[in-house]
Amino acid sequence: MELPEAEGVERGTFIPAEVKMLVDTAEGEWKLLIMLAYFTGARLSDCCRMQWEGVDLAGETLTYTQAKTGAKVTGAHHPDLMARLNKLAGTDKPEIFILPQLASQRTSGRRGLSEAFKKIMRKAGLDLQTVKGAGKRMISRRTFHALRHSFTSALANQNVASELRMKLTGHKTEREHQKYTHHESNNLRAAVRKIPSLGSK
């Protein structure tokens, strides 16, 4: 079971070596999906519906709209993520999804992407860190959403300022997004580059 926000149980995270294990174990579009989540801090549904029109390879940025808040988020490309996107770039239809096969699939439910991710975790030999929740329910501390927490933790471990971490994980309003400056973009790019590389994929 996914970890409900109201449970009060701390969400788990993945260290870089574990993220690499996930990417190496995953197949097809899942490899890029995991990298998108880890290097942008985006939620599962947002990662699946990112479009090529939001990818700026020259500017090394990726822009998407959060389904939960409606906020537009612009994040910087990590070198690992940029390398993989460069390999896939070249479409003349920028409105299409980066992950067209996964974009049409459900995220929740027994056959949803969240459960599929758990299978990848088990195949990679990683612990879901299952704990007892309210009542008799058993819940997992490490799910796909833990990649979002891992992103912010990785930035914090590299002493990236909290305000920059907040920008990278999403603004609260469109007005905040419009306050972006070139200087801030450079700061965001420098912050993301501090996350350790996953090595060859």
Language model regions located:
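Short, polar N-cap/turn motifs at the start of nucleic acid-interacting alpha helices
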Residues: 54-61, 138-141, 160-179, 190, ...
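DNA/chromatin major-groove-contacting recognition/catalytic segments
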Residues: 17-21, 73-79, 83, 87, ...
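Short helix/loop segment immediately N-terminal to the Walker
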Residues: 126-141
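C-terminal catalytic core of tyrosine-transesterase DNA break-rejoin enzymes
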Residues: 31-35, 39-46, 145-172, 179
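Catalytic-site neighborhood detector that most strongly recognizes the C-terminal catalytic loop/helix
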Residues: 5, 13, 66-70, 105, ...
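C-terminal catalytic core of Y-nucleophile DNA break-rejoin enzymes
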Residues: 23, 67-87, 95-120, 136-137, ...
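Basic, Lys/Arg- and aromatic-enriched nucleic-acid-binding interface segment
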Residues: 1-44, 48-49, 58, 68-71, ...
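C-terminal secondary-structure termini that scaffold catalytic or DNA-interacting sites
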Residues: 87, 91-93, 101-105, 131, ...
